Amino acid sequence: MTNDTWNEVRQDLLKVVGKNNFSAWIEPIDFDRIDERTAHFHVPTNFIGSWVTNNFGDLILRQLSAHGAGADRVKFTVSPKAGAAVAAPANTSAPRPVPEMAAAAPAPAPVHHTAPAPAPVAAPAQPRELPGAKLNPNFTFANFVVGKPNELAHAAARRVAETLDVTFNPLFLYGGVGLGKTHLMHAIAWDLQDRHPDAKILFLSAEQFMHRFVRALREQDTFNFKETFRSVDILMVDDVQFIAGKTSTQQEFFHTFNALVEMGKQIVISGDRAPVDMEELDNRIASRLQCGLVVDIHPTDYELRLGVLQHKAELLGAKYPHITFATGVLEYLAQKISSNVRVLEGALTRLFAFADLVRREVTVDLAKECLTDVLRATDKKVTMDEILKKTCEYYKIRQVDMISQNRQRVIARPRQMAMYLCKRLTTRSLPEIGKKFGGRDHTTILYGVRKIEELMQADSQIAEDAELLRRTLEA
């Protein structure tokens, strides 16, 4: 049989198995010969040969027979050159506006981008293998302000970025919104790309991981999905808490995680809580995440906030060189806005733009005028002590009973309500909340939180109690 005949067979197979199955399983096959009623083919991996034998072997034999090339069985031999003749997509030499996950073809050469805002260092080139998410050119180590709350996370991130050799596997960064987790993730990718231009770095959010997996299932193309994720040098997944409770996605993530660890590949993951605090996260995943280095990025302190503002002011000052600041403005903002870095930087950006429009010097009074809503929103901080106090007053019980081992419903239900409010209105972890409630285990706190959530759906009085207490605490 000639190669022309095999090409005709391939076209018939395409019509039968569909484009996705054809691309994943038939296209990588190279015809060799038919010898003693055995059709010989070359394949790039044993896995492909085994899969095609089990799923398409009989179909291939029927199509061969239909084209006058009779054979009784198929035999696959692994060859590194198999599939090399398959044409790459025409657009692989140009940067893609929306990178695709299924990027098995050679990646484009680095493309240099200029940061939209002035920065002390030039924006790095986009890494060659980032099919999941585009990196922010401003999220580099040079633009990351280090202070006591984040110095350990910064040091760990720098260590991982120094080499392709596995350092901490995985490195797990966690903390509240706007504290710098994503910034450090991007910075690691930029630094690794700078040191190792040929490295395959896959950075994406957990939500993107889930959507790509669901699409692969829908299109019956899980092979390419697995190949994409398991052929990388570094896998970086942001906001892993998103897949908690999503059984199939968690199972695939678990297998991907294990495969990369076994191959000695570096994994970096971020989340909004410690693995032990993630409700509905598969215990196997939580256990794996805790096997590496788990680093908490703490809420900002005054010194760090002031440093962030000073750095941001330098960048914005290049864009608005005519704007002047009165003494004490940055210190005032650092003192008043303590929620997170994102809010802090957004407030300063707004202040610069406002001062530019009204052509006035930036003073504390101007800041109060411009940032009324931001300052009001950050004025009130709910603490666990306040929650215990207000909940005890509302239900008319003693605080000593609240943290006791008393299991009577008249005490247990208010206790669970207070646990629920602590979880919803503060950034405290489950173990921290448990410590506040007489040293209870984090699983007890989680049970209490879920119990109130369940009761709120069925009991309007419980829902009303929770809402009234929330309003009282946030007033």
UniProtKB/Swiss-Prot annotation:
GO MF term set: ATP binding; ATP hydrolysis activity; DNA replication origin binding; lipid binding
Annotated SUPFAM superfamilies: P-loop containing nucleoside triphosphate hydrolases, TrpR-like
Region (Domain II): 71-133
Stretches for region Domain I, interacts with DnaA modulators: 1-71
Alphabetical UniProt keywords: ATP-binding, Cytoplasm, DNA replication, DNA-binding, Lipid-binding, Nucleotide-binding
Pfam families recorded: Bac_DnaA, Bac_DnaA_C, DnaA_N
Any Gene Ontology biological process: regulation of DNA replication
Domain of life the protein comes from: Bacteria
Residue spans of biased composition, Low complexity class: 107-127
Span list, region Domain III, AAA+ region: 134-355
Subcellular location: Cytoplasm
Protein's job: Plays an essential role in the initiation and regulation of chromosomal replication. ATP-DnaA binds to the origin of replication (oriC) to initiate formation of the DNA replication initiation complex once per cell cycle. Binds the DnaA box (a 9 base pair repeat at the origin) and separates the double-stranded (ds)DNA. Forms a right-handed helical filament on oriC DNA; dsDNA binds to the exterior of the filament while single-stranded (ss)DNA is stabiized in the filament's interior.
Family: Belongs to the DnaA family.
Protein name: Chromosomal replication initiator protein DnaA
